[in-house]
Amino acid sequence: MPTADRPVATLTPPTDSTGVALGPMCRFGPADAPRIFEHLLALDADDRLLRFSHGIRNEGIAAYVATLDFTRDHVHGLCTAQGDIVALAHVGVRDGEVDFGLSVTSTYRQRGLGRALFSHVIALARLHDAVRVVCHSVSPAVLHMAAASGFRRPGGSHTAPLTLDLRAESHAGDDAQPCPAPSAVSLAAA
């Protein structure tokens, strides 16, 4: 099982619109809260509705970020070489069940970042020996990825959240890295 000093599973980093690789999938901590806030604040009203399943104002986003529990939950994502968060997943692990929320900056959509986050969430759930992943999203893109990944509605109810039941099995390593602060990121590394 992952620990605070052992990062989580990652995928090959996708590229941005210029073909430059984004940083590796990384886990954010309390020091990254301002960057998380900026990422979520940049979402327009429609994107906020899709991300949070309800309308949310700037004050609500500030309250949400202030209540993130980085020791209990997992907040992972992808950053540009400048350290800007362009894709974010907040993953809660409770009693053998994982739920999550995803967001991708509008200019970085249609590049596989959402799919990378989605796959990362499922890998993280397996790493934590979860028996089920729950998807509460109303986003058509997330619902499409969920259906393609085998998520189903329990009992066929159209109002129930989508769930993916996981088989108990051992899974590969946990190799996400902490995200560097924007000032520590070298533009030459891109």
Which residues fall in each region the model found?
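Short, charged/polar, Gly/Pro-enriched secondary-structure boundary elements
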Residues: 168-175
